[in-house]
Amino acid sequence: MTALRPLSGRSRSLRCSSEKMEGTGSWDVLEWTKLDSASWSGSYSNLDCLLESERIIFEACGVILINTDEAGTLLLSNFRILFLSEGTRKLVPLGTIPFVAIEKFNKLAPKVQSNKYHNNENAPTRLLQVTGKDMRIVVYGFRPGTKQRHTVVDTLLRCNKPERVWDLYAFTCGPSQFGNTNPKERLLNEYFRLLGKSSQRASMNMIEDGSFTLSNDLWRITNLNSNYDLCQSYPFALMVPKSISDEELLQTSTFRARCRLPVISWCHPGSGAVIARSSQPLVGLMMNMRSNSDEKLVASFCTQLAGHKGARRKLYIVDARPRKNALANGAKGGGSESSSNYLQSEIVFLGIDNIHAMRESFSRLRDYLDMHGTTSSDGTSSFLRHGGWTWGGGNLSSMSASVSVLGDSGWLSHIQSILAGVAWIAARVAMESASVLVHCSDGWDRTTQLVSLACLLLDPYYRTFSGFQALVEKDWLSFGHPFSDRVGMPNVSESGNFELPIQSSSARSFPSSPVRQSPGSAAAQSSSSSYGLNNYSPIFLQWLDCISQLMRMYPSAFEFSPTFLVDFIDCLLSCRFGNFLCNSEKERQQCGISETCGCIWAYLADLRSSSGTSHVHCNPFYDPSRYDGPLLPPAAALAPTLWPQFHLRWACPVEPNVTETEDQCRAMTVKYSEMKKEKEEAERKVDELSSAMESLNEELLNERDISRAARESAKRATKERAVISRAVQSLGCKVKFTRNGDCTVEVEDGPQKCSHSIPQKQSEDNTTDVSESISSVTEQNVCEAVCPLRTREGTCRWPDAGCARIGNQFLGLKTNFEAFDNLCVYDSYFTAE
């Protein structure tokens, strides 16, 4: 390998001109040097943009992104092309694309030499056009006189087309932090929900021993296909009418293409109506082949109407194909049902075209957007095309021509046909309580689109994140939509070998991009590469486009946003995760996808967990209470428009962002959330202050009670002291009180004059005594005061004798003052007997 130069070997002039190129990114400022080093220094190993297990394998300096005329460095990793801007050293999203997301790539030479490079020997004459499956057409310009382009093309040929499915990056990266759980368990849990058995949870033991065959009054789950012997493209568990035996199911499978017999995809929890799916019946060229078991199975969908005794519901058999295509399939043994053979049935043809028409339409739409966008792959602005300056680039005739090209692509017409068919199916189920059987040819493309969209309209659960995952895994993955064929990945054959899709020349496949090639030009004769174009078709992308149209009509009905759908399809096309590898559940089980690859659902959930409901994947207008039932859009509202978040993100990246309203609403939601948190914090502080105030009030009340009790106790003590004082006075005692609580009582012998000295104010000195002296003047006075021997008339009973109570009591009494605190003395103690 040559012409791949390590970063350390760049010329000084290129590094010095980086500041100048930041604003222009022009070819004029590049100094072209020949790259003669084939080694790579590994200087990009610490790039922040690299994913887990992603490593750089090649580097090409001085590459120009023709779409935006921006200079930079093109890197090739084991997963994708990366384009780093020379000025900012950041990834340029337009020039960064995973290998398997590339539909084709061509070597090109410019048709007309621009005046800008007319006399420049370093003009961009080595061009590589890369056409993506995500609507982008990118052109890289390489240095003349080098083998940069040759080396990049050679690397793309090897990395873009892995020989085996496990050579994909999904296996290199492994499950990592986005580990997968068993998808079979999730399918059974969804079946349980439909049967009204949500309390049951699936487990591996249940799957291994086959004990998942639950049922309700009308429907049951069968394990007849647990080993994929009944139908290799169907899931291991099927939901069928309870009245049909497994033997009858086996007989029915032989009458349907690829053994895809009619089974239930969704059932109404109230009315009992169902949406069933299958492939076309094998009625033959003369439309005269019949199957009693098939007719019985289909008739079992016409259960009795609730509230109508004996009346059975109507059955609509919806053939997604145009009638002429259904008749043409009769030559191959296929065809369509006859209403005369199926009980209470009506056959309806929706006229939706096949995968080849969708592929061509998608290609024409991509070319239209590249031609009339602001980042055309030929480097010319649409405003300057045809020499004009008006809208669309040119005069009135070019304006009308551009509108005509959009209409001629047919993409929006196909979207409208699908939406009209889905709305019709949903209305029959919701308004008539009718059952609907949907099929096309094989029953895995148009059938899957119609059935899953009808479920989305009828069941609000599928309009949530978890419900959307359940819907995709049930109707797209489990029922065998061939993702490997439709997306363009290595296939797994029945024998276990790996095969690559047949290459097809880009000149025969799609109309050319705006770098217009003419017969005989260098571009037309250059090499090209494409990936499985025979079976490639954007069926799943078209389904997501239909959902975006419904989200535009019902902006409050979906929990997820259009940005979520864009990131979802990007993850799918990149094959970074293993969920959508292979063509069927059986093949994914054989390859051990769930154990060895990362899970797209875990990755998307991890993105949302960082920001909660303010994440760009969350719809800020979501109101589940407003749309808690079926969505039945009228026919007049089914006029589709371009999906701006997906269709215009590469063609018109600098135009006004169509999600500005969502972004503003999301910012307001974040601000509201912050203010709500601040309010909650303020309320918490108010509650704390209120609690503190209540606590203080309680303490104040307690203090008040204590103070009241103390005052009452003091009053009682004062009263007791007064009583004691009177008692002591009656005894003619001299009492001496001290602050330490001691009290000395002395009783004098002779009658003395009674005197009562009130103690002075206590001094601050703790040793100051408080004394009280009491003496009697006469015995008569004492007797008159307190003697209990006085008669009622006031005379002493023994007037001639000396008072025996004076002089002989409390002699030498020494007491502790604290004893008085515990002494309760009442006036009644001293009343006369």
Swiss-Prot record:
Chain positions recorded as substrate binding sites: N329, G330, A331, K332, N354, I355, C440, S441, D442, G443, W444, D445, R446, R486
Molecular function GO terms recorded: phosphatidylinositol-3,5-bisphosphate 3-phosphatase activity; phosphatidylinositol-3-phosphate phosphatase activity; phosphoprotein phosphatase activity
Annotated region described as Disordered, given as residue ranges: 503-530, 753-772
Disruption phenotype: No visible phenotype in both normal and dehydration conditions.
EC number(s) per entry: 3.1.3.95, 3.1.3.64
Coiled coil segments of this chain: 660-717
Full protein name: Phosphatidylinositol-3-phosphatase myotubularin-2
UniProt similarity note: Belongs to the protein-tyrosine phosphatase family. Non-receptor class myotubularin subfamily.
Primary role: Phosphatase with phosphoinositide 3'-phosphatase activity that can use phosphatidylinositol-3-phosphate (PtdIns3P) and phosphatidylinositol-3,5-diphosphate (PtdIns3,5P(2)) as substrates and produces phosphatidylinositol-5-phosphate (PtdIns5P); participates in pathway(s) that transfer gene regulatory signals to the nucleus.
